[in-house]
From Swiss-Prot:
Binds directly to 23S rRNA. Probably involved in E site tRNA release. Protein L1 is also a translational repressor protein, it controls the translation of its operon by binding to its mRNA. The gene is rpl1. It comes from the Archaea. This is Large ribosomal subunit protein uL1. Belongs to the universal ribosomal protein uL1 family. One of its GO terms (biological process) is regulation of translation. InterPro entries: Ribosomal_uL1, Ribosomal_uL1-like, Ribosomal_uL1/biogenesis, Ribosomal_uL1_3-a/b-sand, Ribosomal_uL1_arc, Ribosomal_uL1_CS. Transmembrane segments: none annotated. Part of the 50S ribosomal subunit.
Length: 219
């Protein structure tokens, strides 16, 4: 384990303290930052793109755009996604660059029926790619309510060109203990997928606008 729950709780308490986290006029996200050493990103020594369901649901759910198959529309509505588009509505977006960029900017996840994946790649792909976002295929099952709900509380662990990851773990109105559980879920995924304990440099937590706080590493 890269860090203990106790050390995460203590760091989160400091990060959420008003001295380090002045009151804003919006609910801030809380982020976990993990940095690595001795890794050559150009050689592809660390590649992560993992979807992690958070055990403690954030008060501010992730925003999900869903393009279901016809038989999935009613179950998709039950999950109350941020945006629900039919295949026909997606086709009508062709060439509407401003609307497409807005959808790409305002949503975190893009869940798409498999028969619409190619269309999404053509229409939304140019706006998603530069933002590090991507479509995820929906299962073929008629009932996709729970699948969508899982993404509303999921976060993305993704490396880019630098040896670190910065991951959403919740919101500032959550208990430090709950945020710590979410952080542990992310850290466990990193540890299991990348085997990087020997290359760990540091772990930090912070709110959107707050000061960064270092987490004591497990010895």
């Amino acid at each position: 384990m890269l860090a203990s729950k106790d050390s995460l709780v203590e760091a989160l308490k400091v990060a959420l303290n008003p001295e380090n986290n002045p009151k804003r006029n919006f609910t801030q996200s809380v982020e976990l930052i993990v940095t690595f050493k001795g890794i050559d990103m150009k050689k592809g020594e660390l590649k992560l793109r993992e979807i992690v369901p958070l055990p403690k649901e954030p008060s501010k759910p992730r925003k999900v755009l869903v393009i279901p198959a016809f038989q999935q529309i009613e179950s998709a509505k039950k999950a109350e996604p941020n945006v629900l588009l039919t295949k026909e509505e997606l086709q009508k977006l062709q060439g509407q660059k401003r609307a497409i960029k807005k959808l790409a900017r305002q949503n975190d996840w893009f869940l798409v029926a498999q028969d619409s994946m190619a269309l999404v790649g053509r229409i939304l792909g140019p706006a998603l790619g530069p933002r590090g976002k991507f479509p995820t295929p929906l299962p073929n099952a008629a009932d996709i309510t729970e699948y969508i709900l899982r993404f509303k509380r999921s976060t993305l662990v993704k490396t880019k060109d630098q040896p670190h990851v910065q991951v959403f773990i919740g919101t500032e109105d959550m208990k430090p203990e709950d945020l710590a559980e979410n952080a542990l879920a992310v850290l466990n995924t990193i540890e299991n997928k990348a085997k990087v304990e020997a290359n760990l440099r540091a772990i930090y937590v912070k709110t959107t606008m707050g000061k960064i706080v270092k987490v004591e590493l497990k010895k």
